[in-house]
């Protein structure tokens, strides 16, 4: 392009050429120019086309097109060479035909009338259908509200039933818990009274066995008075025990009003009368005891399920609680014999333990044969656990009661003790992984276990007693030499140069470090 003159430059500045923006053009076509005239739109479109191509540069055909202008690709790719202008003109012609047909339809009045009539008929049908639908929806709504009300009523009834059942179960649990607490209190009171009686029971075993021994060695002027007072107090205690038992039998409805025994109040109280009264109460209690034991044992087995059955399958005593009690009480001789064992080594007044003369001679012969062995003051187990017919000692049963009481107190004060602790320890042991030393395999690490100190391996014996000669011989032979440490007279000391005669080690000497 050549240089422009000053007048041309001024003219360009006075009439600046509008720049074309594609986004502004599309916005104007879609929003602002939808109501414009056709002529105006056509002129604008032509101006837009010129503006679109104004910045184009004239470019010659490429070398590829020049070289492949007459390229024959076959029948499949056959066609006619056309320009873009011809294609766009055909599209514009089709658009103009469509617009012309639409204008003809709008100009015809008959078509408008028919369309209006058809539309009115369609509106009537739509109104009738909408009315029918409204009626159906109203019926459905009414049915739905009825169903909802029924469902709410059922849910409220079920909720009320659940609440009543929970409250009833809670009240039953509260009653059961209160009954258990009362049973524990009664058991504690009985154990407390048994603990108070234990000391007097132990002291009663110290009394003389025979009345002659009492009168001959220990009786005083007030002995008969004290004996009578003690017997009266014992009878009073028996009366209170019988009254308590009868009261408990009535409370537990074991006895009816007609079967209730008369109050035991004899004019002259003897031991045989009390034995008869307690025997009657025992026969009445036996029926109640058997029913209660069978009832609760079956309940415990049912609650435990298969675990109780499997645990008791291989036991030697696979019997009910009632049968076990009957078996234990049937062997009454064995039970009485256990009460005659002198566990506390009580020595009644006027009674002396003694050993037979044969035991003494036998022990003397053994000591003569083994002179080097120190004498041992043996106390036979017969004297420790001898049977005395005049004592009553149920310490084994008393210890069982005390252990049960202590365990119950510990569990009530600390719920995390006893069985709970063992169960938690087992669960924690199962959770934690075992600490396995992987480096100890294939002999790469020496395995060893530290042995604990041997303590209390054998209980010390207090009956060992050495004489002076044995003690001197022991200390003289500590270093593997035997020294004669016998005392000599002063005259022999002057004659002998050494105070002690050292003898070379012999085969029969006692060695510790030789």
From Swiss-Prot:
Residues 354-378 have a biased composition (Polar residues). Residues 25-42, 135-144 have a biased composition (Basic and acidic residues). InterPro entries: AATF, AATF/Bfr2, AATF_C. It is found in: Nucleus, Nucleolus. Residues 14-153, 353-382 are annotated as: Disordered. Its main location: nucleus. Keywords: Nucleus. The keyword Nucleus applies. GO terms for biological process: maturation of SSU-rRNA from tricistronic rRNA transcript (SSU-rRNA, 5.8S rRNA, LSU-rRNA). Coiled coil: none annotated. GO terms for cellular component: nucleolus; small-subunit processome. Residues 118-134 have a biased composition (Acidic residues). PANTHER family: AATF PROTEIN APOPTOSIS ANTAGONIZING TRANSCRIPTION FACTOR (PTHR15565), PROTEIN AATF (PTHR15565:SF0). Belongs to the AATF family. This is Protein BFR2. It comes from Debaryomyces hansenii (strain ATCC 36239 / CBS 767 / BCRC 21394 / JCM 1990 / NBRC 0083 / IGC 2968).
């Amino acid at each position: 392009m050549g240089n422009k003159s000053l007048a041309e430059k001024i003219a360009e500045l006075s009439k600046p050429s509008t720049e074309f923006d594609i986004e502004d053009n599309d916005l104007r076509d879609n929003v602002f120019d939808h109501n414009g005239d056709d002529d105006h739109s056509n002129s604008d479109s032509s101006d837009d086309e010129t503006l679109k191509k104004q910045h184009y540069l004239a470019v010659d055909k490429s070398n590829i097109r020049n070289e492949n202008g007459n390229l024959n690709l076959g029948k499949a790719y056959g066609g006619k060479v056309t320009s873009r202008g011809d294609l766009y003109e055909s599209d514009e012609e089709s658009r103009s035909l469509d617009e012309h047909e639409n204008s003809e339809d709008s100009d015809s009045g008959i078509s408008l009338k028919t369309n209006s009539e058809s539309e009115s008929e369609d509106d009537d049908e739509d109104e009738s259908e909408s009315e029918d639908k409204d009626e159906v929806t109203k019926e459905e709504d009414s049915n739905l509200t009825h169903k909802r009300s029924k469902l709410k009523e059922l849910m409220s009834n079920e909720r009320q039933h659940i609440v009543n059942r929970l409250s009833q179960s809670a009240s039953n649990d509260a009653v059961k818990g209160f009954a258990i607490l009362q049973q524990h209190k009664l058991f504690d009171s009985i154990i407390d009274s048994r603990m108070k009686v234990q000391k007097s029971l132990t002291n009663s075993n110290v009394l003389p066995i025979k009345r002659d021994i009492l009168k001959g060695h220990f009786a005083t002027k007030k002995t008969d008075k004290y004996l009578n007072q003690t017997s009266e107090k014992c009878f009073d205690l028996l009366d209170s025990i019988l009254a308590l038992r009868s009261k408990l039998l009535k409370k537990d409805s074991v006895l009816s009003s007609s079967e209730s025994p008369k109050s035991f109040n004899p004019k002259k109280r003897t031991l045989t009368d009390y034995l008869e009264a307690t025997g009657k109460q025992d026969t009445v209690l036996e029926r109640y005891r058997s029913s209660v034991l069978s009832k609760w044992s079956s309940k415990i087995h049912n609650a435990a399920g298969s675990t109780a059955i499997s645990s008791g399958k291989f036991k030697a005593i696979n019997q009910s609680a009632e049968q076990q009690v009957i078996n234990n009480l049937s062997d009454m001789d064995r039970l009485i014999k256990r009460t005659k064992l002198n566990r506390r080594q009580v020595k009644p007044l006027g009674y002396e333990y003694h050993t037979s003369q044969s035991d003494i001679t036998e022990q003397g012969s053994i000591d003569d044969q083994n002179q080097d062995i120190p004498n041992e003051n043996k106390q036979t187990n017969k004297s420790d656990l001898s049977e005395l017919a005049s004592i009553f000692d149920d310490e084994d049963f008393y210890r069982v009661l005390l252990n049960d009481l202590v365990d119950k107190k510990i569990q009530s004060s600390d719920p995390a003790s006893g069985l709970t602790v063992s169960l938690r320890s087992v669960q924690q042991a199962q959770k934690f992984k075992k600490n396995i030393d992987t480096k100890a395999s294939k002999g790469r690490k020496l395995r060893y276990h530290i042995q604990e100190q041997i303590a209390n391996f054998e209980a010390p014996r207090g009956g060992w007693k050495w004489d002076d000669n044995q003690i001197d011989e022991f200390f003289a032979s500590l270093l593997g030499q035997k020294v004669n440490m016998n005392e000599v007279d002063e005259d022999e000391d002057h004659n002998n140069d050494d105070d002690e005669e050292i003898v070379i080690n012999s085969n029969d000497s006692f060695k510790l470090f030789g």
